[in-house]
Amino acid sequence: MTAPLPLDTRKLLLLTLAVLVVWFANLDYRKLIKPDEGRYAEISREMVASGDWLTPRLNGIKYLEKPPLHYWAGAAAFTLFGQDEWAARLWSALTGVLGIALAYYAGRSVFGASAGLYAAVVLGSCLLYVVVGHLNTLDMGLTLFLFVSLCAFMLAQRDEGSARENAVWMHTAWAAMAGAVLTKGLVGLVIPGATLVIYTLIQRDWRLWQRLRPITGLLLFLVITAPWFIIVSMRNPEFAWFFFVHEHLLRYTTTIHQRVEPWYYFLPLLIVGWLPWTA
């Protein structure tokens, strides 16, 4: 007779099956929500139709507000699976599932198998995480890359890891930051950087900055991000000012984008979003 699976393995398999069913079985249960879902799906559709995967366009007009990674993923899904709601939301669903898997792996690696399992269960059952994982928006892809960068940074600090393993994890963090930048812009670099500064101030471990592999890490970051930014700027001379100044500097320093919410705007969203664990 086949030996029964260990308890933790059975739990993990059941959790994996439940997540896959919840995430992928009902991606097309409703129409795309205006304006974001429809906008991003249309940009991906126009990439496929025009064959121009360099300059995003919406209704034939250049759409340079955000980098192209999410649009590329949507266009690839449309090419492989057809143009429908399921394919439009596939990238968000995939990145959501990968985030849950990463929560398990990172928790298990640092704190043990039970901690990893609980981390995956909590993350995968949070209301906001489930909802965003079923929306065709940039947020879940950005969340995954930020999560990878921070978890990889954490794993690179383990004393039990070899020098080679720690170097791999640190370069993974740099690559993930590059993915975040290609998803939603410079916020993909600012958030991990700010987190690192705060962590350093708390730990007072200034040698941490020497372990970042800044030369090879930054080189890897630029190898991933620079080609699109350079080429799209050459093809679209207005891109650099519009993207870096209008969409970044002015967005966060002025009210030009009508972002006038108070500083506590996201606190109620977080409380509701982390249900049922905030109940």
Identify the function of each model-found stretch:
Residues 2-279:
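Membrane-integral, polyisoprenol-dependent glycosyltransferases
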